[in-house]
From Swiss-Prot:
Annotated InterPro entries: Ribosomal_bL33, Ribosomal_bL33_CS, Ribosomal_bL33_sf, Ribosomal_zn-bd
Main location: plastid
HAMAP family given in the database record: Ribosomal_bL33 (MF_00294)
Gene source species: Cryptomeria japonica (Japanese cedar)
One GO biological process term: translation
Matching SUPFAM superfamilies: Zn-binding ribosomal proteins
UniProt family annotation: Belongs to the bacterial ribosomal protein bL33 family.
GO molecular function: structural constituent of ribosome
Keyword line: Chloroplast, Plastid, Ribonucleoprotein, Ribosomal protein
Gene Ontology CC entries for this record: chloroplast; ribonucleoprotein complex; ribosome
Name listed for the protein in its UniProt record: Large ribosomal subunit protein bL33c
Subcellular location: Plastid, Chloroplast
PROSITE patterns: RIBOSOMAL_L33
Lineage: Eukaryota, Viridiplantae, Streptophyta, Embryophyta, Tracheophyta
Amino acid sequence: MAKGGNVRVTITLECTSCTQDSVNKKSPGISRYTTRKNRRNTPLRLELKKFCPYCYKHTIHGEIKK
């Protein structure tokens, strides 16, 4: 049987360049993706390169707090 409870958690990834541009009011929105990660294998914050429809390019999306 499996040990422990929730090892996999649902996280939200947010575009880092859109959040920086939103302060300057250049971006029309902020791109967000949801995914799941294993807490034991990746205890640090996750960063993935994903497509941002607001920037029209692939940018780094970082994990944010809920």
